[in-house]
Every structure is written in C-alpha cells, then in structure tokens.
C-alpha cells in the first residue's frame, strides 16, 4: 500500500515538500485490549460480561459461560485464569472482592481511543512483590479462603459431636456392665440362699441345736437386762460393780457366739452324711458354700439379736412363767415352720 502524500501547492504553481498524514504511523492498542473492549461493548453479551453502571470498569457475571463461549471465540482458548493473568500484566485491578470486576484508568466505556495509553508492564513478578498481595488480582483462588474457614469450622463441629458420642457410648457400656454384674450377684445370692436352707433342713439335729441355743441366749439376755435395771434402781450398789457386770456379760456373749459358730461349722463339715446332693451345696459358679453360709449366719444372728433386745425390754415387767410359755410356743411351732420350708426345698429340687 502506497503512502498517501499531501502536496501543498503554492500560488505560483510550484509544489513544496510532501508531508505524511497525521497519526499515520502511530501504533494501535494491543489486540488483547481491543478484543476485550469489543466483548464488553457488545450488548448481546451483557448477561456474561458488561460495563458497570459508571462505565469505568467491566464485570464478568458468569465466569463459566465466559470461559466456554466468549474466550474461544475471541482468544482461541478457554482458560479463564490465563485471561486474568493478561489483565494483570496490563495493570488492571480487581475492584470488588465479591465478584469479577476489573478496572483500568484507560479502559472506559465509549472511549476506545484511551486504550493506547494502557501499556504492558515489564517484570510483572517483581512489581507484584513490591506492591504486595493487595494490588494483585486473584487468579483462580477467589473465595477459597472463606471456603477453607467454613470447612475448618464444620470439621471442629463434627469432631466435637464425635467426642460426645464416644463419651455417651462409653457411659452406656459401663452402665450395661454394672447392670450385668448386679444381675449375676442377685442370681448367685438366690442360689446360695436356697443351698444354705437345703443344708440346714437336711440336718434336723443342727436345726434343733440352733433353736436351743437361741432360746438359751435370749433367756440369758433377758435376765441380764433385768439385773442391770435393778442395779441402776438400787442406791446401795456402787459404781465399781456395774462395769464388771457389763464386762462379764460381754464375755459371755462372745463365748456364746463362738460356741454357735463352732456348732455351725461342725454341721457344715458333716455334709457327706446328709441327704443333700453334692451339687446342691455348691453354688452356680463352683465356689465353696462356707463363706456364703457364714455371711447368712451372721445376718440371722443379727436379726435374732435385734429381736432379742426388743423382747428383753418388754420382759422386764413380765414374770418368769410367761417367758416359759413363749419358749414352749416357739418349740411347738417349729415343726410346722420346718415342714413349710421342707416343702419349698422339695419343690426347688435341692433335696
């Protein structure tokens, strides 16, 4: 293409020097800026990319559609991050952190001639380091920090819930174990009690000796209580005699308990001569019955002592013949009580 020349003709008809047209050799804006300006100016693409209300910046409304439709048509690629990097090299800055809005002093709506003022920056990496992260455009990481924070919060909440559920599981497991132990203990006590009753009523001699000892012990306790009350009411009794009576009564009670325990242990040793089967004496878990029998024996003795003390308080004003009548009644009613328990033992299969 030949250069267009202007020829100035003077009045005398002699041409002067030829001058080139103004702006003929000026360099136009870079193709990237021109194509970007055309995309923003095109009203048919306003749903994807358009000017802001002030027309001093442009907004990418739909980055996905922008990458799949407009970038391939204008730039022969679909890499949105590459487009952002190109904007960064030409000095564009991100205006709104919540959306893809960019601005440049030379990129204004209706003023395309200002594109020539936009220059490509050199040493972009060095200038970015000097300006800091605030002046840089986010490239593919928009909203990532907020998303990471949200995920961290969700993780902490889930971890807290897991810890609570594990604590509840452990507590429930401990309760189940404790309940199982209680059930086993109750079952074991029932079996031991029935075995003990079967052993007692399989030996009538032991039962009779036990009743005789109980009657004798109650008799002594009532007499001692009556003596103590009479001694406290008598003024001639000195204070030194009372501790001796207490100590003697305690010694007699200890001797009484020792003799009863010896009698009970002797009866337990005669297990082979009784009519009870061997498996009825052993508990469900195969342990010996002597410790269990001792515990039951102590409970029976404590109940008898409590009932004996109450009876002794009532007997202070009662004459001796009435006491004999109570003993006879006790001896007479014993066979009936034994028959009822014997029937119970027979039904349970211990004899």
From Swiss-Prot:
- Gene3D superfamilies xref list: Winged helix-like DNA-binding domain superfamily/Winged helix DNA-binding domain
The keyword Magnesium is annotated on this UniProt entry: no
As for PTM, the annotation reads:
Exhibits temperature-dependent phosphorylation.
A GO BP term here is:
cellular response to heat
Coiled coil feature spans: none
Among the GO molecular function terms of this UniProt record, one is: RNA polymerase II cis-regulatory region sequence-specific DNA binding
Q: Which keywords has UniProt assigned to this entry?
A: Activator, DNA-binding, Nucleus, Phosphoprotein, Stress response, Transcription, Transcription regulation
Subcellular location as annotated = Nucleus
Superkingdom is Eukaryota
> Entry's SMART domains?
HSF (SM00415)
- Give me the positions annotated for DNA binding: 29-123
What are the annotated GO cellular component locations? nucleus
Q: Does the keyword Transcription regulation apply?
A: yes
Q: Quote the function comment for this protein.
A: DNA-binding protein that specifically binds heat shock promoter elements (HSE) and activates transcription.
PANTHER family, alphabetized: HEAT SHOCK TRANSCRIPTION FACTOR, HEAT STRESS TRANSCRIPTION FACTOR A-2
> What assembly does the database describe for this protein?
Homotrimer.
The record's comment on protein family reads: Belongs to the HSF family.
Its protein name is Heat shock factor protein HSF30
Per the UniProt record, the source organism is Solanum peruvianum (Peruvian tomato)
Taxonomic path: Eukaryota, Viridiplantae, Streptophyta, Embryophyta, Tracheophyta
